[in-house]
Amino acid sequence: MAITQERKNQLISEFKTHESDTGSPEVQIAILTDSINNLNEHLRTHKKDHHSRRGLLKMVGKRRNLLTYLRNKDVTRYRELINKLGLRR
């Protein structure tokens, strides 16, 4: 199921770095992580949905690139985000 606008606004308010922040790496990674988790649940029940699986792989790759960017830019923000989201990196 797609991420709702209310859930997206909740993630933005939780991970924003300043008042009008909607596009910082932290916000983008949080939204992608939520979408990835939702898509994982979908794929557990619909194992043959290869079209959605490709979308999942694209989202995981995009999140990985954003995490690498954030790690190179500011390690402390990267570590805080990883702990907050519960990612394994």
Swiss-Prot record:
GO terms for molecular function: rRNA binding; structural constituent of ribosome. This is Small ribosomal subunit protein uS15. The lineage of its organism: Bacteria, Bacillati, Bacillota, Bacilli, Bacillales. The keyword Oxidoreductase does not apply. One of its GO terms (cellular component) is cytosolic small ribosomal subunit. The keyword Cell membrane does not apply. The gene is rpsO. Residues 1-21 have a biased composition (Basic and acidic residues). It holds the Pfam family Ribosomal_S15.
